[in-house]
Amino acid sequence: METITQTARVFYTAQTHTIGGREHGVSRSSDGHLDIKLSTPGTAGEGTNPEQLFAAGWSACFEGALGIVAGKKHVKLPEATAIDAEVDLAADRNGFFLQARLNISIPGLDRVLAQELVDEAQNTCPYSKAIKGNVNVQYNLV
């Protein structure tokens, strides 16, 4: 197993334990805050799936990044700021892959300024940086 060289300060490490994968699986966090059932999309299963979890985590992280970028510009994000994330599980002849869209609403903010915040947040959000060049993404200011 390859080790990770720590070159930066780690702020937080999430730990989960998953059994069963996306078909009838369960996943729990070490702190007990997350305890979920997993199911394959389109089946009668009662659980969530990795795509929904990614969409929730990414949209929350991106909104946090928007707040950081806005703060640096001395701009207050409206309370009604919201993000609708869509993450597709797709396949082609090379296998499975993800593609995604973030639909970002920043009501009441000048559209040019809002777009600047969205553009800068893409380079701030750890999720966006992690998938850049690996996942086809559309960032839509709505």
Segments predicted by a language model, with ranges:
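Extended beta-strand/beta-hairpin segments
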Residues: 1-56, 63-142
